[in-house]
Design a protein with these regions (language model features):
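N-terminal export/targeting leaders of redox proteins
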Residues: 12, 58-59
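Bacterial N-terminal signal peptides
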Residues: 44-55
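N-terminal secretory signal peptides that target proteins for export/translocation
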Residues: 1-42
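Active-/binding-site microenvironments in catalytic and ligand-binding cores
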Residues: 8, 25, 32-33, 60-357
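Hydrophobic alpha-helical segments and their boundary regions
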Residues: 41, 46, 148-151
Length: 357
């Protein structure tokens, strides 16, 4: 009887994700001789691969996400010329639905204070220079002071991501080509000035609370099951047009450990993002800097949640939220109010949203 050879899963260069799975599969197939190439050996090999991946801690459904083709995502459900995406949910009835949640009139601020000491990712900066003037010569001795700010007003602090911010290849939301809408002075379509004021039902999904921790572990991927269990625990269901806010606890590091804050973070993964998109929210926000888990479990994929929500589905992102007070008071449902700055052609905006209950 022919000896069955073991398939080795020990590969010094192996790491999590699709690349590792492919290497294991190739190695397995190489060990199947012509006499053994039938359905049963392939089934055994497949089971061996799955068991090996699980044993090594590699997710079988690793996030090997690839963007859909243009004709699968465009035109937008809001129309081929649409520039507002999920902001189209903003209607009088949306505002009225939100105001019905206000019982005490308490206002909870959801934005961090902007200062030169805030966490900054990549090449972003926030430099403030005080501009002092002398007293003028009028009899009332009026003086004047101002500030000069050198910064990216769209991508610092608590920030709102608009549609030009991310692309799939050379196209943004609704398949507008970057080369055709980008100008020296901003984007001629999809600019943040098109969004307008957003007043809607806000829902805090407290995943850190669900897990019984102050801060979720670094690089923890929030799953669909996490979101569903947290909502059940809070006795809430999502509705179209909601502002969905996810509490990870990562915001506790803001201004205290900026290096750790900006290095990685817990957040939603691909499956959770696709599930949220099906709930048809107005926006998805979190108390971390990219909303999604970083680094991505698949090292070959870069920030796919941004593409899934912004580019494919036309759903806005809200980053670097201050959620500790909201979570501590267990305010899970509230009126959400936010207005992006009216900056023509910008891809995002620094914002100061509030929750009112």
């Amino acid at each position: 009887m022919e000896d069955d050879r073991m398939i080795s899963l020990n590969d010094d260069t192996a790491h999590g994700g699709r690349g590792f799975a492919e290497r294991v599969a190739r190695k397995a197939l190489q060990q199947i001789t012509p006499k053994r190439r039938g359905p049963m050996p392939y089934l055994a090999i497949g089971i061996t691969i799955v068991i090996g991946l699980v044993a090594l801690g590699v997710p079988v459904d690793a996030q090997s996400w690839q963007p859909p083709a243009d004709d699968q995502r465009c035109p937008s459900k809001w129309g081929a010329d649409d520039e507002r995406g999920s902001a189209n949910h903003m209607k009088p009835e949306t505002v009225l639905r939100a105001t019905q949640l206000i019982k005490s009139g308490e206002v909870i601020e959801l934005a961090h204070v902007l200062s030169p000491s805030i966490p900054l990712v990549g090449t972003r900066r926030f430099d403030v220079h005080t501009k002092r003037t002398f007293m003028n010569q009028a009899s009332n001795r009026r003086g004047s002071n101002e500030e000069i700010l050198i910064s990216e007003m769209g991508q610092v602090g608590t920030q709102f991501d608009g549609f030009p911010h991310q692309t799939i290849a050379d196209k943004v939301y609704n398949c507008f080509k970057v080369d055709e809408i980008a100008s020296r002075g901003g984007f001629t379509k999809l600019g943040i000035e098109k969004v307008g004021a957003l007043i809607t039902r806000g829902v805090l999904i407290d995943v850190a609370g669900l897990k019984g921790v102050d801060i979720l572990p670094d690089t923890y991927e929030i799953t669909v099951q996490d979101l569903e269990e947290a909502l059940r625990r809070q006795n809430l269901q999502l509705q179209p047009g909601d502002a969905v806010i996810i509490h990870t606890g990562w915001g506790k590091l803001w201004g205290k450990d900026n290096a750790r804050y900006g290095k990685s973070c817990p957040g939603i993964g691909v499956q959770a993002a696709e599930w949220l998109a099906k709930q048809d929210p107005m926006l998805v926000g979190s108390d971390n800097w990219p909303v999604e888990v970083l680094p991505n479990p698949d090292p070959q994929v870069s920030a796919p949640v941004h593409q899934i929500l912004l580019v494919v589905n036309g759903i806005y992102l809200l980053e670097n939220l201050k959620l500790e007070e909201l979570a501590a008071k267990r305010v899970h449902e509230f009126a959400f109010i936010m207005q992006p700055l009216k900056m023509q052609g910008f891809s995002g905006s620094t914002v100061a949203p509030i929750a009112v209950r």
